[in-house]
Amino acid sequence: MPILKPKLEVPLSSPNLPVPIMFRSAVAPAEGIYPLHQHAWGEFVYSFSGVMEVKVADHHYLAPPQYGVWLPPQLQHVGLNRYEAHHCSLYVGPQLCSALPATPCAVTVSPLVRALLEHLRQQPPGQDATPQHTRLLQVLLDQLVTAPRAGSYLPTSDDPLLGTVL
């Protein structure tokens, strides 16, 4: 009997973001999957614990806590994880994406970026409308623009023999 994987709801289905930069955090259960989707905005995916996986066409990106994954606007992707993962997404309006990569990539997460993401995760609901919150999101975006790129971070394979080695 096949094991059913929990399908996670794609967080935003609206064609537009309510604000230019938006932060969202969640806990994804083991074997969770965000089905194939795309949005009009860019997305930076980060995992506080566990490893988030992002599949884009025939590329597979892994995001352990040292890395995040940048996804430019209008890119179809699937998000998944093998074990429970505490993760977040930074949604970036298309008007702010020009300084970020035009293709998906793994991004090195500096201690400052990690601290900003952790701070945002700890904020109570309703803080996202304040000028201070907006400035903090802009600083985070500025840091991501200059962060080193890391390709896909780790090699992966669907081959059963290679999969055990990798």
What are these regions (language model features)?
Residues 124-166:
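Short, Lys/Arg-enriched, Trp-marked, Pro/Gly-tolerant hinge/linker segments that flank
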Residues 74-104:
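Ligand-binding loop in jelly-roll beta-barrel domains
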Residues 45-64:
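A short beta-strand-loop-beta hairpin characteristic of the jelly-roll/cupin
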Residues 1-51:
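Generic protein-terminus/edge-of-domain signal
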Residues 95-119:
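Double-stranded beta-helix
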Residues 28, 58-73:
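Short acidic-glycine-tyrosine-enriched beta hairpin
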Residues 40, 56-58, 83:
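A generic beta-sheet turn/junction motif
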